[in-house]
């Protein structure tokens, strides 16, 4: 009885220690993806915040072409001083298995010198793919997340005003051809390449569906043998994607954004014992102009300007501090915070730690 209890307890501890995730959260089906669409159009109804047409001739040209298609002829040489029109680029993503009549969201971005797209309406804009075929038509009122006001030479702005979004603003007019259901194999692609995870997913599928049902081709691709036919493959994939797989530990990685100074690390990062000295060196250059004028204005003297430069060099910090070995992320954070370094200093410290072999992680700078 005691042996059974201990065995059940050990099994419970092992099960809770291993983190299980569904295959659908770790992979995607090769070939089932979105496709980008792009179009050029006009936004009207702006409250005097549109393009300055004298500086954006393409806006006037586009408007003339649109009016001519509507049967309106603008006299040659007419200088239209329009403030309520803006030229925009419209982008969208065509989802996999998108059908005719289905609506998708579009993003509208100004390409001229419009001050704001707030309150504007996008006129009918064809959206094309890389093959120059029209796959959707976009039109509708633009929702801009920003706000702004100006008066007397002063202005206040919150967030971006030259871009917006139209929810369900485009209607799919052409469907993409799909190869789904053709053939007896499908490839599952891992979100992150990992040989052990690829093999583990293949083993899990083989245990449930029989040996030979899945094969790990490389660190990212698992080939699965599926029955022929759309409906059969849909049912087969639905069962596979809901299978649970124990997630293996990730590679220890530290990501540094050199533009913003942000540092992000995952929980696998560890440190070995080391000593760190970080000093701050600042140089201040101050230049002043001294003006010397003669005491007697009519004595024939000359005004002389002499520059005076003062250079101040200061160095602070630099004491050697010990960093203890840390085996968990919380301890790593405490050890790095104990140095009292700024994020910019921390980037150079982490690079030096990796060079010294004290940082047990991959360092990626973006």
Curated annotation (Swiss-Prot):
<keyword id="KW-0732">Signal</keyword>
<protein>
    <recommendedName>
        <fullName>Flagellar P-ring protein</fullName>
    </recommendedName>
</protein>
<dbReference type="GO" id="GO:0030288">
    <property type="term" value="C:outer membrane-bounded periplasmic space"/>
</dbReference>
<comment type="subunit">
    <text>The basal body constitutes a major portion of the flagellar organelle and consists of four rings (L,P,S, and M) mounted on a central rod.</text>
</comment>
<dbReference type="Pfam" id="PF02119">
    <property type="entry name" value="FlgI"/>
</dbReference>
<comment type="function">
    <text>Assembles around the rod to form the L-ring and probably protects the motor/basal body from shearing forces during rotation.</text>
</comment>
<feature type="signal peptide">
    <location>
        <begin position="1"/>
        <end position="20"/>
    </location>
</feature>
<dbReference type="GO" id="GO:0071973">
    <property type="term" value="P:bacterial-type flagellum-dependent cell motility"/>
</dbReference>
<keyword id="KW-0574">Periplasm</keyword>
<dbReference type="InterPro" id="IPR001782">
    <property type="entry name" value="Flag_FlgI"/>
</dbReference>
<dbReference type="GO" id="GO:0005198">
    <property type="term" value="F:structural molecule activity"/>
</dbReference>
<comment type="similarity">
    <text>Belongs to the FlgI family.</text>
</comment>
<keyword id="KW-0975">Bacterial flagellum</keyword>
<dbReference type="GO" id="GO:0009428">
    <property type="term" value="C:bacterial-type flagellum basal body, distal rod, P ring"/>
</dbReference>
């Amino acid at each position: 009885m005691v042996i059974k209890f201990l065995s059940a307890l050990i099994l419970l501890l092992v099960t809770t220690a291993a983190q299980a995730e569904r295959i659908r959260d770790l992979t995607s089906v090769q070939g089932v993806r979105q496709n980008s669409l792009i179009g050029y159009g006009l936004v009207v109804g702006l409250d005097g915040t549109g393009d300055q047409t004298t500086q954006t001739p393409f806006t006037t040209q586009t408007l003339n072409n649109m009016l001519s298609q509507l049967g309106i002829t603008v006299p040659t040489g007419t200088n239209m001083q329009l403030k309520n029109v803006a030229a925009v680029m419209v982008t969208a993503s065509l989802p996999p298995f998108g059908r005719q009549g289905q609506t998708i969201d579009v993003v509208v971005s100004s390409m001229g010198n419009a001050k704001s797209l707030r309150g504007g309406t996008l006129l009918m804009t064809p959206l094309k793919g890389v093959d120059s075929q029209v796959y959707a038509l976009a039109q509708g009122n633009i929702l801009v997340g920003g706000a702004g006001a100006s008066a007397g030479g002063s202005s206040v702005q919150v967030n971006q005003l030259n871009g917006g979004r139209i929810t369900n603003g485009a209607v799919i007019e052409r469907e993409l051809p799909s190869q789904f259901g053709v053939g007896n194999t499908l490839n599952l692609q891992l979100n992150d390449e990992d040989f052990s995870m690829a093999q583990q997913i293949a083993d899990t599928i083989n245990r449930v569906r029989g040996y030979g049902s899945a094969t790990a081709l490389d660190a990212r691709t698992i080939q699965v043998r599926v029955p022929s036919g759309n409906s059969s493959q849909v049912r087969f994939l639905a069962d596979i994607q809901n299978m649970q797989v124990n997630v293996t530990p990730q590679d220890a990685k530290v990501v540094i954004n050199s533009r913003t100074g942000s540092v992000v690390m995952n929980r696998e990062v560890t440190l070995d014992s080391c000593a760190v000295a970080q000093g701050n060196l600042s140089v201040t250059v101050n230049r002043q102009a001294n003006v010397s004028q003669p005491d007697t204005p009519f004595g024939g003297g000359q005004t002389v300007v002499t520059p005076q430069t003062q250079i101040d060099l200061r160095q602070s910090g630099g004491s050697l501090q010990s960093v203890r070995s840390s085996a968990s992320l919380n301890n790593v954070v405490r050890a790095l915070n104990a140095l009292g370094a700024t994020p910019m200093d921390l980037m150079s410290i982490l690079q030096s730690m990796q060079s010294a072999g004290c940082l047990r992680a991959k360092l990626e700078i973006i």
